[in-house]
């Protein structure tokens, strides 16, 4: 773990590569089909990544910072086995041993760009770090910090259990949002020790939450997700929570 903290970074923009299907003619729309490739040079070897065009704000920001040299000399400051490796903290440049890292930023955030379920947290996914929902309910991304998914392989039954949990979480989130709108009323009831009133309100809000949840489709992993998570692996519980804006194409190992 300590050795991984010393992985120095340099990110170079390699250029754009067109992705045509066999037999497809090149035309004026070709510019929209090019994918930017970057090389992340580390003290343990090079990693080549491509950036998705469907997440233009994240793509352009990443390219901008790379060209400015912002990432040069930074560290992979957070390395968690079977989960991910995180980098991009400007405070990690020349950081002394033992310094707490992870809070550095560039003074701005990027609006979330979820292209889900097309892009998800399979092994090798390049994603943007962000602050938690309690201070960042819109899930905006850090302006500079990113992570690469290492993850682990899951079996079908585990993924099924995760689907069930995500659907239960949806109901809980709806209930909490409804309760938040009644906080003044709840506070008054608590202050007055009105247990019956609190119980009745809870039942009312829970019924509303169930009704609202029933209007939304149940969550299920796609065939592509199941195939990836049961073979190469990943971190499925992050799907739809963090912006995936690219992927590793070489150097993952």
Q: Where in the sequence are the language-model features?
A:
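Bacterial Sec-dependent N-terminal signal peptides
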Residues: 1-26
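Cyclophilin-like peptidyl-prolyl cis-trans isomerases
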Residues: 20-253
């Amino acid at each position: 773990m300590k050795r991984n903290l010393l992985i120095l970074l340099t990110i170079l923009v390699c250029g754009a590569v067109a992705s045509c299907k066999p037999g497809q003619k090149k035309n004026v729309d070709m510019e929209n089909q090019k994918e930017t490739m970057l090389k992340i040079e580390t003290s343990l070897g090079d990693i080549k990544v491509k950036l998705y065009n469907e997440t233009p704000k994240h793509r352009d920001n990443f390219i901008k910072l790379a060209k400015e040299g912002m990432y040069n000399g930074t560290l992979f400051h957070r390395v968690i086995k079977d989960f991910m490796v995180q980098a991009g903290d400007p405070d990690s440049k020349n950081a002394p041993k033992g310094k707490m890292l992870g809070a550095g930023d560039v003074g701005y955030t990027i609006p979330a760009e979820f292209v889900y379920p097309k892009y998800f947290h399979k092994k090798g996914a390049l994603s943007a770090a962000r602050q938690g929902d309690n201070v960042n309910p819109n899930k905006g991304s850090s302006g500079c910090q990113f992570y690469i998914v290492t993850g682990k392989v899951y079996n079908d039954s585990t993924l099924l259990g995760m689907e069930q949990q995500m659907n239960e979480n949806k109901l809980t989130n709806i209930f909490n949002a409804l309760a938040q709108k009644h906080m003044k009323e709840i506070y008054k009831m608590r202050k007055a020790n009105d247990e019956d009133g609190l119980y009745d309100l809870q039942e009312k809000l829970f019924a509303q939450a169930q009704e609202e949840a029933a209007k939304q489709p149940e969550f299920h992993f796609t065939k592509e997700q199941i195939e990836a998570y049961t073979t190469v692996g990943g971190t499925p519980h992050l799907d739809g929570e963090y912006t995936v804006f690219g992927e590793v194409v070489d150097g993952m190992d």
